Amino acid sequence: AIKDSLLSAVIIEAVVLATRSGQVVLYQLTDLGRQAALAHQIDPGPVPRESLEHRWWVVQARHDFEKKGYEVTLEHPIQGNGAVDLLAVRPGETIVVEVETGKSDIKANLSHIKRSQYDKMIMIATSPEAVSACQKAIEKVGHHPELPAVELLTWLDIS
């Protein structure tokens, strides 16, 4: 009842994510919800830099890599200016992982990562649209023999 009231008052909004086994519904504050919280002297926290969808899939990817024996660092700084969503390390292997919702500049992200030296690069697309966008970006950036190829995974591979 409370959730429905908050939804109808546009204080929160639902974010529906497809998973291998169905879907997950997450909720986040709207701008109106942030204003309402502040009006009642409740700190809504900082405005997230990333979408709720992106943050959720980064956590899922972290759990997936940890289950496979990797030590995982979130928002790992890379050469130049920026960070990758995940750095997964285990003896003899270092992997950079980018979670892509299809809403960012995938080609720029990919080009930036390719300049860094890692054993493997993985992009995780979170939807069919993101798969398409990632495939196009990978084709545009191309493969360089001295750099590792990009492996494209989907939400079905980690959910």
Language model features by range: what are they?
Residues A1-W57:
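Interdomain/boundary linker segments immediately adjacent to catalytic/signaling cores
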Residues I11, E93-V96, Q117-T126, V150:
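Hydrophobic beta-strand segments of well-ordered beta-sheets in folded domains
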Residues T19, G33, I124-V131:
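Short beta-alpha junction loops
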Residues R20-Q23, Q79-A83:
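Short acidic/glycine-enriched loop/turn segments that link adjacent beta-strands
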Residues L38-G80, V89-P91:
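Acidic-basic catalytic patches of nuclease active cores, encompassing PD-(D/E)XK
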Residues E75-I78, E98-G102, I124-P128:
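Structural motif
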Residues G80-V96, G102-S104, S111-Q117:
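Active-site beta-strand-loop-beta-strand hairpin of nuclease catalytic cores
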Residues P128-S159:
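Domain-level recognition of nuclease-like catalytic cores that cleave nucleotide substrates
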